[in-house]
């Protein structure tokens, strides 16, 4: 078993309040398995977000999705197990708003076989072409040393639901810089 104790988030907000307008916690796990029917998609991305904080902090260029991305945040804000999924996932499995998927996370402890922590279900509330912090494609070397493109899939869920399903977990802190400040400060 592994144990994680959450640091005091207020300490970060106090230390960064001069240089950042907004801060938010983001659970980012690129080792999530998405399950649809009998199929599994390993190495998918799960983002656990607080919708209000995330909307105030992150940015996304207009015109990349059918609607403004705030509408997608609003769609999961009132559905505790609501999820936003990437359009490539929806296309691969012919998924629509209202359908359900399951996503699994694994223990960070190194073992011979991955140990699944939990596998909650989520109700699809929105489908997006683009999302802050998500790259649909990664590039890696195969066994022969050739660089190959690998497609990834996204699930965005409510932060509180992710924590209730998987327990406390390390998170990233995302910030939006205040006017007149840069990332090197």
Label the model's feature ranges.
Residues 133, 137-140:
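A cross-kingdom feature strongest in bacterial/archaeal respiratory oxidoreductases
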Residues 90, 163-185:
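A short beta-strand structural signal in non-transmembrane regions
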Residues 36, 112-113, 163:
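Short proline/glycine-enriched turn/loop segments at secondary-structure junctions
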Residues 4-10, 181-185:
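Short, conserved charged micro-motifs
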Residues 7-105, 119-130, 142-146, 150-154, ...:
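Short beta-strand boundary microenvironments
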């Amino acid at each position: 078993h592994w144990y994680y104790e959450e640091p005091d988030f207020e300490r970060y907000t106090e230390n960064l309040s001069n240089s950042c307008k907004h801060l938010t916690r983001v659970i980012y796990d690129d080792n999530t398995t998405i399950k649809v029917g009998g199929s599994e998609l390993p190495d998918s991305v799960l983002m656990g977000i607080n919708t209000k904080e995330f909307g105030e902090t992150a940015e996304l260029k207009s015109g990349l999705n059918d609607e403004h991305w705030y509408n997608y945040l609003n769609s999961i804000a009132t559905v505790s197990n609501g999820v936003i999924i990437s359009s490539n996932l929806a296309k691969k499995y012919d998924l629509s708003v209202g359908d359900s998927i399951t996503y699994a996370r694994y223990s960070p402890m190194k073992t011979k076989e991955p140990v699944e922590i939990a596998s909650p279900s989520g109700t699809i509330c929105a489908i997006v072409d683009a999302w802050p912090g998500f790259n649909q494609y990664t590039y890696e070397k195969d066994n022969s040393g050739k660089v190959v493109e690998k497609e990834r899939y996204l699930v965005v869920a409510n932060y509180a639901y992710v924590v209730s399903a998987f327990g406390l977990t390390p998170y990233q802190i995302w910030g939006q810089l205040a006017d007149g400040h840069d990332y090197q400060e």
